Every structure is written in C-alpha cells, then in structure tokens.
Amino acid sequence: MITRGRVWKFGDNISTDAITPGRYNLTKDPNELAKIAFIEERPEFSKEVKPGDVVVGGKNFGIGSSRESAALALKAAGVGGVIAKSFGRIFFRNAVNLGLPLLIGNTDPLLDGEIVEVNWRSGEVKKEDGEVLKFKPLDSFLLAIVEEGGIIEYIRRRGDLWIQ
C-alpha cells in the first residue's frame, strides 16, 4: 500500500463539519460528497485533488459529529489517506471501516503542496528532498480491514471479524 501525491495540509481541530459541511451534505452519493470536501476550508480542494494525494492534519483531525460522510468524501475524492497528530475517535473508525488509510505522528515537517510517497503499511513517508519521516501505522488488524477496502469487504472475504 504505497501512494504518491500532493500534501493538502490543515491545522488542528479540523471537524467533520469542516470536511463535509452540513448545509451541503445532502446526499449519500460518494461522488457528490467528494465535490463538497473542504468546500469552505479550501474551495479548490475538490477540483484540484488527485488520486494518491494526502490530507495532513494536526491534532484532533475529524473531531465533532459522527459524520461518516467526512471519511467517505475523502476516499471518493481519491485521497490516498490521512496523516495527523491525532484523530477524533469516530472519524478514525469511520475511515478504517471505509478503507481509508491513516497514520499518526508529528506532521510539522510535512509542507502544504509538496509531493510525498507514503507507505501506509510501514508508516514511512518519503519527501522529495529524500528525507524519510516515520509515522505510527495502523495495527495489523485495522490495516487488514483497510487493505480489504473496508469492513464490509473484509467480512465478505473473510467471513467474520474474529481476531487471530
């Protein structure tokens, strides 16, 4: 699970309402949700985001209401995953359940607009200047869910959620 793309950097306390604002959040269609991702925070996001791009946050990324649409919008937009100092617990589980990779660690060295290569399995992020940053990857069980494409595909393929 390696992606390469542009860093879209955000600050601390980015709520699910900032990712998919309620007044625009009128559909369950993933492609329509992708169009409203960060519409008020970064209006250019939905038009410029490319497959493999990485959303980077500070502390408490995805806090707030239990809006599954926030993680779904990012995945549908083609985001390769999200790296943050910490995550809101509900966003964290929604992202895993939808198959959106996550890493945790100090995001200060990552710069908005730079191109990075992310190994979601090992937690290594390689910057264009050659610097390699190390982040905490998901544990093996959660990573298996993400690699299957989310909880539904995980259960379809494996038959249950039994942890071995």
UniProtKB/Swiss-Prot annotation:
SUPFAM superfamilies per the UniProt record, alphabetical: LeuD/IlvD-like
Biological process annotations from GO: L-leucine biosynthetic process
Record-linked InterPro entries: Aconitase/3IPM_dehydase_swvl, AconitaseA/IPMdHydase_ssu_swvl, LeuD, LeuD_type2/HacB/DmdB
Any GO MF annotation of the entry: 3-isopropylmalate dehydratase activity
Catalytic activity of the protein: (2R,3S)-3-isopropylmalate = (2S)-2-isopropylmalate
Highest taxon listed in the record's lineage: Archaea
Keywords: Amino-acid biosynthesis, Branched-chain amino acid biosynthesis, Leucine biosynthesis, Lyase
Pathway assigned to this chain's UniProt record: Amino-acid biosynthesis; L-leucine biosynthesis; L-leucine from 3-methyl-2-oxobutanoate: step 2/4
EC code(s) of this entry: 4.2.1.33
EC category: lyase
Record's subunit section: Heterodimer of LeuC and LeuD.
Function: Catalyzes the isomerization between 2-isopropylmalate and 3-isopropylmalate, via the formation of 2-isopropylmaleate.
Entry-linked PANTHER family: 3-ISOPROPYLMALATE DEHYDRATASE SMALL SUBUNIT, 3-ISOPROPYLMALATE DEHYDRATASE SMALL SUBUNIT 2-RELATED-RELATED
Family: Belongs to the LeuD family. LeuD type 2 subfamily.
Listed name of the protein: 3-isopropylmalate dehydratase small subunit 2
